[in-house]
Design a protein with these regions (language model features):
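OB-fold and OB-like single-stranded nucleic-acid-recognition modules
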Residues: 18-166
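Sec-dependent N-terminal signal peptides
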Residues: 4-13
Length: 166
């Protein structure tokens, strides 16, 4: 009797999971009422990326002082959001598909010309493959990630990056 009761209880909990799914109702057009709407990416500017301050912080693992970022409110609101950003492509390692997008051409970038760390963004591509040349001016779309703690990455990262065709 106890076994029968347990089986009946299990069936009553599991059975609803196997009911057929009814498709969502249609509107007068062809779109579904519950159709997801893709978020339009925010057109990010280098000016907005300047909403950050830096202070020197000691990193014992590398025995060096480095600049630690404190992101302003306007940039914090964009963390994890879809963005588009235009800049100059700087190849870091072609074989690893490692690229940086810079506010400035190579001769004036953060690495060579003395611009600040807020003027470069790491591109983490959704799909590897396309090769870019130094100083190609391109627009990329992806998810903005703010990085304050990983000293082996840049402060700004565009994850799942894709080039926007123009």
């Amino acid at each position: 009797m106890n076994r029968l009761l347990i089986v009946l209880l299990l069936v009553s909990f599991i059975a609803p999971a196997f009911r057929p799914v009814t498709p969502p109702a249609k509107t007068s057009g062809s779109a579904s009422v519950l159709a997801p709407v893709a978020a339009e990416p925010v057109k990010l500017s280098w000016e907005v990326l300047r909403d950050v301050t830096f202070k020197k912080k000691w990193y014992a693992e590398e025995s060096v002082y480095m600049l630690y970022p404190t992101f302003g409110q306007s940039i914090q609101k964009l963390n994890g959001k879809a963005v588009e950003l235009t800049g100059y492509v700087l190849p870091v390692d072609l074989e690893s598909n490692l690229y940086v997008l810079s506010a400035f051409p190579y001769s004036a970038c953060f690495f060579c010309g003395g611009a600040g760390p807020e003027s470069v963004v790491s591109l983490k591509f959704k799909k590897a493959g396309k090769k870019f040349k130094t100083d190609e001016r391109r627009t990329f779309r992806g998810t903005l990630k703010l990085n304050a703690d990983n000293i082996y990455e840049l402060n700004y990262i565009i994850a799942d990056a894709e080039m926007v065709e123009q």
